[in-house]
Regions:
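N-terminal assembly/transducer modules of large multi-domain enzymes
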Residues: 1-120
Length: 120
């Protein structure tokens, strides 16, 4: 599938989802039990995962998949939101932003795997 025709849409929608993640993570930092915020972050990560996968951006897909998994654990009560987790999530957001900037500049997400974030 030739995805080049969808690149501009992908970039615009990714910017929106990253802004949502940023806004909601700031709320989560202050209100770690806020279920609406937790659900909003889960949905944004899920949407980004699907979009990245469709476009073939595997690194972005993997990172958002891992973020989605974390929020599924939080939603199910198996994990609590702690300051250390929020810090890791902000690092993940920074990595996603870097992937997007690479995509904007080169149409490629780059080669950084961000294993240290994924394994944190």
């Amino acid at each position: 599938m030739d995805v080049s025709q969808y690149l501009e849409i992908f970039i615009d929608e990714t910017k929106e989802h990253l802004q949502t993640l940023s806004d909601q993570l700031m709320i989560l930092e202050q209100e770690p039990e806020n279920t609406d915020t937790i659900n909003e972050i889960f949905r944004a990560a899920h949407s980004l995962k699907g979009m990245a996968g469709t476009m073939g951006y595997k690194r972005m897909q993997r990172l958002t998949h891992d973020m989605e998994n974390v929020f599924q654990e939080i939603r199910s009560g198996n994990m609590k939101v702690k300051p250390e987790l929020v810090d890791v999530l902000f690092r993940g957001l920074d990595a996603l932003d870097a992937y997007l900037n690479n995509i904007i500049n080169t149409a490629d997400e780059g080669t950084e795997d961000n294993e240290e974030i994924i394994n944190a």
